[in-house]
Amino acid sequence: MILVLDAGNTNMVLGLYEDKNLIADWRLSTDPLRTADEYSIQVIQLFLQSNLRLEDVEGVIVSSVVPNIMYSVEHMVAKYFKKKPIIVGPGTKTGINIKYDNPKEVGADRIVNAVAAHEIYKKPLVIIDFGTATTFCAVTQSGDYLGGAIAPGVKISSEALFEKAAKLPRVELMKPSSVICKNTVSSMQAGMTYGYGGLVDHIVSKIKQELMDSGEKEPLVVATGGLAKLISEESETIDIIHPFLTLEGLRIIYEKNKDLDA
């Protein structure tokens, strides 16, 4: 079995693969102050609840956009899984060509998503990841990662309203039945859900046009991340939701690098 781990700014997502099959997935909160032993308590408990054994894990791969968490994660893997994890970063074999001005600036999660989508769909792509930030990535059919756009995430936008506007409350992210709302909570929810659908469609339309102007066929638009389903209901451009795109990308990258890391 292969353990894949993606550490984002808000959540850490873990997946366990047997061959190409995802047999378990879990989500933990990301906390840079948590020690390797504290993370291990949670991970061991998750394994036990799923009737899985740590010693059956043959390899581990990690991607992270939170540098301060890596010491604890690497030591947790070394101490409790007795493995040296593959870390997605410069020098990792991915199978895509990064055309960024400075490739080191590209978040590991964006690279991993691009690897998965390119491998699965074999088409020009626009990839949207609804995380702490909402990222948009453009990938050619041949596997060139061209770059993209970054917008504030839906949740942090909602939190900013709560923190900066004295009379606006913290609200649950859900779609009201109408965009013409008659109370503050529903009005904020309408702005977040209906508004983000418009943001997504406008950025995606621009990226698709630039890709096609460069000679690519019409791109497939793939969305992932915790809020992909909610926002896609108000988007006219999203073609596919792949909830485990990042985990799948980590599995693919592991297969490309496991012998190199031996």
UniProtKB/Swiss-Prot annotation:
Entry EC number(s): 2.7.1.33
GO cellular component: cytoplasm
Residues the entry annotates as binding ATP: D6, A7, G8, N9, T10, N11, M12, V13, T132
Catalytic activity: (R)-pantothenate + ATP = (R)-4'-phosphopantothenate + ADP + H(+)
Amino acids binding substrate: Y100, G107, A108, D109, R110, T184
Keyword Secreted (UniProt): no
Principal subcellular localisation of the protein: cytoplasm
Entry annotated with the keyword Nucleotide-binding: yes
Protein name from the UniProt record: Type III pantothenate kinase
Gene that encodes it: coaX
